[in-house]
């Protein structure tokens, strides 16, 4: 915080992947106390578990999975009290980039709908996003798509994804 406060930037952008979206939402919630909220201009969330994921719901039941997944596994559940739902929704311009397979079933056949292997698109949507785009990619693979990079750059510059 001290370095950022010393630099006092005019504008800050967040680009997150997966749980990084929950970290950004938590940070955004604490910014008013530091007088920074007006400086957060845009947020791009790539494959965010904004409402949690059924995959975490399944694994959080296992003691071994909780041990391997670490203390943050419960934060990724769909539990409205303790899970991803409990993080505040930012009012900054937000764009979502979501991975899908592009069919009725996604990469994880145990999930009911199209998905990136971990996240179902409806569980990523906040409701106040300015724009969203779907890319055929897995949860980790989406980071290595040149299309993802182009989308991030375009949204940070314009607040929209290219083909909107």
Question: What is the predicted role of each segment?
Answer:
Residues 1-91:
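Serine-dependent carboxylesterase/thioesterase catalytic core
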Residues 89-164:
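C-terminal catalytic-base region of ester-bond hydrolases, centering on the histidine
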């Amino acid at each position: 915080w001290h370095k950022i406060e010393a630099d006092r930037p005019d504008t800050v952008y967040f680009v997150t992947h997966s749980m990084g979206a929950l970290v950004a939402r938590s940070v955004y919630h604490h910014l008013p106390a530091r007088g920074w909220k007006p400086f957060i201009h845009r947020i791009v969330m790539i494959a965010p578990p904004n409402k949690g994921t059924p995959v975490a719901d399944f694994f959080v039941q296992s003691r071994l999975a909780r041990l391997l997944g670490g203390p943050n596994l419960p934060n990724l559940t769909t539990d409205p009290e303790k899970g991803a739902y409990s993080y505040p929704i930012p009012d900054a311009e937000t764009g979502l980039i979501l991975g899908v397979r592009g069919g009725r079933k996604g990469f994880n056949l145990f999930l009911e709908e199209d998905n990136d292997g971990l996240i179902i698109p409806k569980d990523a949507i906040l409701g106040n996003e300015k724009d969203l785009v779907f890319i055929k990619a897995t949860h980790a693979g989406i980071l290595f798509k040149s299309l993802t990079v182009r989308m991030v750059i375009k949204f940070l510059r314009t607040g929209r994804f290219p083909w909107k």
